[in-house]
Amino acid sequence: MDIIFKDLINLWGKPVNKEKIDLNLPIGSISTDTRTIEKGNFFVPLVGKNFDGHNFLNMAFDIGVQGAIVSKEFNGSIPAGLPHWVVSDTLDAYQQIALLHRRNLNLPVIAVTGSVGKTTTRELIRGVLSSLGEIVSSTENENNEIGVPKTLLRGMGSDAAFVLEMGMRGLGQIECLSRISEPDIAVITNVGQAHIGI
């Protein structure tokens, strides 16, 4: 990860417990899941209908994360020594980090969407481009507001390109995913009636 802590200050201001970190060091790999988190990672607790990642802040701290993002709506326990930024929305912050990483890498981004055929088209493009080097591509469930940033954050400077799949579950979602990823090339497989009711 090429993002340093000072970059996060440019996004959200100074963190709580700023003295605990060297602002010129990389923030480490981004993790949203304490089941796979490792020492030196940066923790982003996401919130859903049936879960709240903030409940695992203490576990993440015990594992040895370098820092975290915390929603201003969270009223629970935050480890006393944890460097963290307080933000309005942790998902939005996660997306901002992914966009910053995408811009730093400056790799070509190809986005694929459409009523049908997205996954097949994505895999065909990935296969064609594979002769150029490593292609970072969406997996089956990485085509939404959480998955697209996750794919972008997997990218490295040695990679050749991103091929992203973008699904739509609501009005404005493709616009949101496009803002996160800033695609250089957009592929629309077709436009049918699959999402008329959304």
Question: Which role does the model predict for each range below?
Answer:
Residues 1-96:
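N-terminal leader/targeting and accessory segments in enzymes
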Residues 12, 93-198:
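Phosphate-binding loop of NTP-binding sites
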